[in-house]
Each structure stands twice: as C-alpha cells, then as structure tokens.
UniProtKB/Swiss-Prot annotation:
The gene is GLIS3. This is Zinc finger protein GLIS3. SUPFAM superfamilies: beta-beta-alpha zinc fingers. Residues 289-307 have a biased composition (Pro residues). GO terms for cellular component: nucleus.
C-alpha cells in the first residue's frame, strides 16, 4: 500500500497526538489478544479513508503539482499486511501500524468509490491491500455513513468555521486565542471542515522544512513509539504551545492578516509529492535528538504610514526634513502673496521638500537649484498647486518674479514713514505709493466723465458702468442685480447670505409654540346648551341648530352589523315640513338599508305630548335632543343588565342585530364609542310633557344630577338637560306600552323606560370631515 504526503504543508503535531490517542485503545486490545479484532465502536470514531482522499485531492488542486514522489519519514515501522481471513468489521494490528499517523481509518468507509491512484498501487502483486481487496469489507449496514473529518486545525484548535467564516479575518485570531484548546484534544468538532488547509497566517504556524536528523518521535499511551508526522512536528508542537499558553501579542492582533496560497520561506517548489516504497525503510523505530530551540519570530510590521508620508517611502534618500510634509500650506495675505509657516519656509517644488529657517535661504535655493538647473528655454513653474498649471514663461526674470508669490519674498517695500507694507512686484508698490501721494493718472475715457483712478484696473471697472455692460449677474433666484466687476458681485452675494440668516432666525422664533397657545388647544371648553325643538321649529330653522352649537355628534343606537360600515350617518327622520333645498341625507334615502317607503314623514309623535322629532340635522351642527325611541326597539328582548354605580339606576344595554330595527333605526358610522346606557324614569306618563327650554336657561352641573335621590318630573327633566348638555347624549322617551322592554317588569308596570346612549365624539373645530345623514 502506498501513502501520500505533502512536501510543503505539513500538519502540526496535534494531529499526530490525536490520531495516537484514538488508535491507542485499539492497539492495547490488539496487544492483549492478538487474534481479537477491534470492535466496531472503536473504529467508528476514526476518520475514513474517504476523508483522507478528499483532503489529498483538495491539497493537490491547491498546490498544482506536476511531479509526484512519495516517501515515508524515518522511523516508520513496516508490519505484516492485513490478514485475508479477517472479519468485515475488524482490523489487525499490522494494518493499523502500516498506515501513516494521521491517516483516517474506518471499516465503514466506501473504499471502492475511490480511484486506485490515491493508494499508490503500481502492480497487481503488491503485498499491500488495494481498494479492490478492501472493498469486500465495505458492505456493512453502516457503509454509507461517513465519519467526521479531522484536520490539523480541527485537532488542536477546534474552530467553528460556520461562525467565523462570516466575520473579518482578524476574528479568526481572536477566536483561536480565546479557545485555549489543547493540541491533544480528542473530541472532534462536528462543524469542523477538514479541507480548510490553505489558510496560513501568523495565527497558524507555518511549516518549515528541517533536516531529517531533527525529526521527533511521539510515544503513544500504549507504549508504541510513533514518529512525528511531517518534517516539522516538534517545531509545530512548540509553536502551538506558545500560541496557546502565551497568547497573542497586541501588535500581532492589530496587524494580523490571513494569507492564501503563499509559498513557504525556504521551499523551492510548492506541493511536490515524493513516492517511494514503504518496505525500503528500516523496520525499527529510531530515536532522534530533540529539535533545536525555536528561533525568535520577526517583529510585526508597523502601522501603515499616513497619506502625506507616502512620498518618503519612495524617496529614502531625502533627509530628516522630509518628515515635515504634514505641515499645512502657507496662507495668502490680502495682496495674494504667501507668508512664512511657523518660522519655517518649505520648498514645495516637485520632488523637493526642503525646509529653511530664513526666507532668503529659500529664495536662493529656488533660484540656484530649480531655476538655474533648467536647460534651454523651458521656464516653467513646477510648484505644487500653482494656478498656472505648468504654463511656461518666455523669460527667466519673469519666472523669478513669479516665484516670489510662492516663496513669499517681498523685496519692494513702502518708503513712507510708518507704512510697513511690502510687495513682490514693483508695479504693486507704485500703485500703493499713489495712495500716499494722491496721484491718479488714469482718467476715465468716457466723454463727459472726469473721474480719475490710481490704477488701470479700477478705471476699467468704472468704464464698464458707462457701457452698461454688466456681465456679473447674481445667480440667486429672484434677484436681477448685475455688476461690472466680480468684487461687487461678491459683496452683493454676502449681503444675500446675511439676509437669509436673519430670515431664518425670524422664522425659527415665529415657529416656536407659545405655552399659552398649547394650553388653549388642550383645554376642554364648556359646551353651550342648544335650544329646544319647539324653538327650532318656531324660528324656521331646518336641518341645523340655532346659534353656535357645540361640535358634538350624537350617536343613537344602531345594530351591530352597521357598526362596521363607515362613511355616512343616518339622520333621525325627515323634516316636519317640505324642505326646499336638498340635504345630504336625501341623497341616500333609496339605499337598501333605508328604503323611503318605510320612513313616513312625521310632524309630531304625540300631539298631546308636544314632543317633536328633530329634523335632519346639518352635518356640522348636531345638538343633543330629546327624541322618541323607534317602535321597533320596544319589540325586542334584551339581555340582562348590569347595575351601574352612578346611583340613578343606569343600565347598560348591548344592541342585537335585528332586521326589523334596520329600516327605522338611526345609524351612525365612523364613530368609535358604542356604549349604550339606559335610565328608567320614576314619573308617570301624564307628566312626560317637556316644558320649553330657553337657550339662555342656566343648566346645572352634571355632578349635581348624580345624587341618588328620588326624582320627580321636574328634577328628572333637569337631569336630562344637564346630562344632554354636558355629555351630548340623546335621550329617548319610551311609551307606556313598553312595560317589559328588558324582559322584566320594572319598578312599576305603568312606568316606561327612558334609555340613554353614550357614543358621542368630541372633536376640534374644522378638523373632522362632514357627517352625512340618511333619511
């Protein structure tokens, strides 16, 4: 049997120790009883050959090796081959030791699914079992079950790549540092991937080939000495121990990177395999001297340089003055000329960053080094940020004068006493001297204009006003101002900005809400009482309440199947006399729920009782009234009531869905509250005449009407008016024939019940949409 091994990437010694610890129980049982086979429970925990094949394939693809040569490290022991009379689930001791350490073994693996070249079989008479021979043992019931894969990473570290793969590369280092797993950890992680061998970084020790004389030997617990896997087993083991016990340095964590596919430091070719026969090695274990101490790791690289210092990395010949590139640029004064920077004068010519203490030294440096060294007629300024954009001059002196702007040299000083101004150009000094002498040699050339100026530029600006050519227009929307010179336009734009700031301040101060304003919006104002129906009919007002009525919408009882509809509110009844103008309620009288044939016009319910039905109210002014209850309500059976704690025997009532109630019912849609309360009166039917109530009458407070006392007709009317005024509740008067309205006899068989329905909505004026009524 032939075994493959990588020449470059060698797993750490943790895999060897893991494999030895897993094999050792089987080896001990095999040594105690030579003819006993390893039970399936022990071999099931080992890695299958299929895992080894997949790992080898992935490594072969990543290394792209063309030449292959296989060999075993020194000290491997060749034992007799596998017995032909072994059982299906058993392996001999020789078969166990003939495999390299770290090779996965399992009797449940599907060996016949692997190609023969993975096992290195070169001839049919090989003494080692081929996949064909071993395929006879792969037909057990558990043959399709693949064992867990173990890799150099999964043995010693136990990394959960499902969690780390979605994070940054540096998270892998923090995870390894925090896990503190032992290299000899025996519990394989179910989520570990055995093919993750291509990641190399400072967190994973990089293998380095060592001479064959320095290969260490690991001793299994059973007493058998197994050689270290790979060429760098001892070094990898020591490095992993340093990584686990010492932890990572802060600098390493900050500059940690994961490198993919980089060759080793001493490797000459990547991924070359070597093949040799296993029987050529000696059959005894060789004890080798220990490996030399681990060389010190190189210091981690420093942080990347700042952006402005990149030029120093490419120009190491520059002196220590190159470290001053981060200094800010020099500022320009009012005359457009440059001042010095903190006592230092920096040369910003291309590929130069010299610093000088004196300005004269910088001027001499520019002239001798940068200008005089130019050959031919090329007089171009290469100063960084020069607005000329490498436009050349036609003379040397012009370039020298121009360089004064960059160097800050001002040789032309004012000669007047007390004036300390200096200029880089002589022309500017002459113009400045005219301000002292009052000389204005530049006269306006427009006929009839006698203005004179000290410089030609000011005269040119003035002459544009005569020609009415104002090319500089204000670009602010709504502004039509135009100017002859850009300086005037700049001043105008500044004035615009100051005006906008003032307008913003005023707007900010005006938008702030005054506390009194907010208090007025949140205060519940008292409601004004509405006039009686008699007053409304006498005044001839149809469909609206006289005077400024409160914005309370009374909601009479409606069936539950109407509560889900929204949009319109059914009015009470048609008006007592024909209405000349159509109301919103008349537009929907022909609806299927409110047919017009079932709503006869009513002028008065009872002529002797002086009770009037209210006309169709206006959508915006609906006042609480006393209206008669529909006759269909009197024929309904009501559920038991609950006693209210108010003291006036208020009873709650839950309406039921009844088809007989729909035509004459008064329906209000779009409201939230649907609480109905009923109050049985305590006065005889003869006293039910409602006296006319004036709109100016004083209404007592609602709290005064809740005292639990025996009430007569007058007190109950007062209660009705107070209750309707303060809460917007419609009061229904029931006839005397409804003595058993609620399924029970009330206090007196001749007494009727007046029920109250509380489902009103108080709203802010002009904030709710109109509520339309149905006739």
């Amino acid at each position: 049997m032939m075994v493959q091994r990588l020449g470059l990437i060698s797993p750490p010694a943790s895999q060897v120790s893991t494999a030895c610890n897993q094999i050792s129980p089987s080896l001990q049982r095999a040594m105690n009883a030579a003819n006993l086979n390893i039970p399936p429970s022990d071999t099931r925990s080992l890695i299958s050959r299929e895992s080894l094949a997949s790992t080898t394939l992935s490594l072969t693809e990543s290394q792209s090796a063309s030449s292959m040569k296989q060999e075993w490290s020194q000290g491997y022991r060749a034992l007799p081959s596998l017995s032909n009379h072994g059982s299906q689930n058993g392996l001999d001791l020789g078969d166990l030791l003939s495999l390299p350490p770290g090779t996965s073994m399992s009797s449940n693996s599907v060996s016949n699914s692997l190609p023969s070249y993975l096992f290195g079989t070169e001839s049919s008479h090989s003494p080692y079992p081929s996949p064909r021979h071993s395929s006879t043992r792969s037909h057990s019931a558990r043959s399709k079950k693949r064992a867990l894969s173990l890799s150099p990473l999964s043995d010693g570290i136990g990394i959960d790549f499902n969690t780390i793969i979605r994070t940054s590369p540096t998270s892998l280092v923090a995870y390894i540092n925090g896990s503190r797993a032992s290299p000899a950890n025996l519990s394989p992680q179910p989520e570990v991937y055995g093919h993750f061998l291509g990641v190399r970084g400072s967190c994973i020790p990089q293998p380095r080939p060592v001479p064959g004389s320095q290969k260490g030997v690991l001793v299994a617990p059973g007493g058998l000495a197994l050689p270290a896997y790979g060429e760098d087993g001892a070094l990898e083991h020591e490095r992993m121990q340093q990584l686990e016990h010492g932890g990572l340095q802060p600098g390493l964590v900050n500059h940690m990177v994961v490198q993919h596919g980089l060759p080793g430091p001493d490797s000459q070719s990547a991924g070359l395999f070597k093949t040799e026969r296993l029987e050529e090695f000696p059959g005894s274990t060789v004890d080798l001297p220990p490996a030399p101490p681990l060389p010190p790791l190189p210091p981690p690289p420093g942080p990347p340089p700042p952006y402005h210092a990149h030029a120093h990395l490419h120009h190491p010949e520059l002196g220590p003055h190159a470290q001053q590139l981060a200094l800010p640029q020099a500022t320009l004064d009012d005359d457009g000329e440059m001042d010095g920077i903190g006592g230092k004068h920096c040369c910003r010519w291309i590929d130069c960053s010299a610093l000088y203490d004196q300005q004269e030294e910088l001027v001499r440096h520019i002239e001798k080094v940068h200008i005089d060294q130019r050959k031919g007629e090329d007089f171009t300024c290469f100063w960084a940020g020069c607005p000329r954009r490498y436009k050349p001059f036609n003379a040397r002196y012009k370039l020298l004068i121009h360089m004064r702007v960059h160097s800050g040299e001002k040789p032309n000083k004012c000669t007047f006493e007390g004036c300390e101004k200096a200029f880089s150009r002589l022309e500017n000094l002459k113009i400045h001297l005219r301000s002292h002498t009052g000389e204005k040699p530049y006269l306006c050339q427009h006929p009839g204009c006698q203005k004179a100026f000290s410089n030609s530029s000011d005269r040119a600006k003035h002459q544009r006003t005569h020609l009415d050519t104002k090319p500089y227009a204000c670009q602010i929307p709504g502004c039509t101002k135009r100017y002859t010179d850009p300086s005037s336009l700049r001043k105008h734009v500044k004035a615009h900005s100051s005006k906008e700031q003032q307008a913003r301040k005023k707007l900010r101060s005006s938008t702030e809400l005054h506390p009194d304003l907010l208090t007025d919006c949140l205060t519940v104002q008292s409601l004004q009482p509405a006039t009686s129906p008699r007053d409304a009919a006498a005044e001839g007002t149809v469909g609206r309440s006289p005077g400024p009525g409160p914005d309370l919408y009374s909601a009479p009882i409606f069936s539950s199947n109407y509560s889900s509809r929204s949009g319109t509110a059914a009015g009470a009844v048609p008006p007592p006399h024909p209405v000349s103008h159509p109301s919103p309620g008349h537009n929907v009288q022909g609806s299927p729920h409110n047919p017009s044939s079932q709503l006869p016009p009513l002028t008065a319910v009872d002529a002797g009782a002086e009770r009037f039905a209210p006309s169709a109210p206006s959508p915006h002014h609906i006042s609480p009234r006393r209206v008669p209850a529909p006759s269909s309500i009197l024929q309904r059976t009501q559920p038991p009531y609950t006693q209210q704690p108010s003291g006036s025997h208020l009873k709650s009532y839950q309406p039921e869905t009844n088809s007989s109630f729909q035509p004459n019912g008064i329906h209000v849609h779009g409201f939230y509250g649907q609480l109905q309360k009923f109050c049985p009166p305590h006065y005889p039917d003869s006293q039910r005449i409602v006296p006319p109530v004036s709109s100016c009458s004083v209404v007592p407070s609602f709290e005064d009407c809740l005292v639990p006392t025996s009430m007569g007709q007058a007190s109950f009317d007062v209660f009705h008016r107070a209750f309707s005024t303060h809460s917007g509740i419609t009061v229904y008067d029931l006839p005397s024939s409804s003595s058993s309205l609620f399924g029970e006899s009330l206090r007196s068989g001749a007494e009727d019940a007046t029920f109250l329905q509380i489902s009103t909505v108080d709203r802010c004026p002009s904030q709710l949409s109109s509520v339309y009524t149905e006739g």
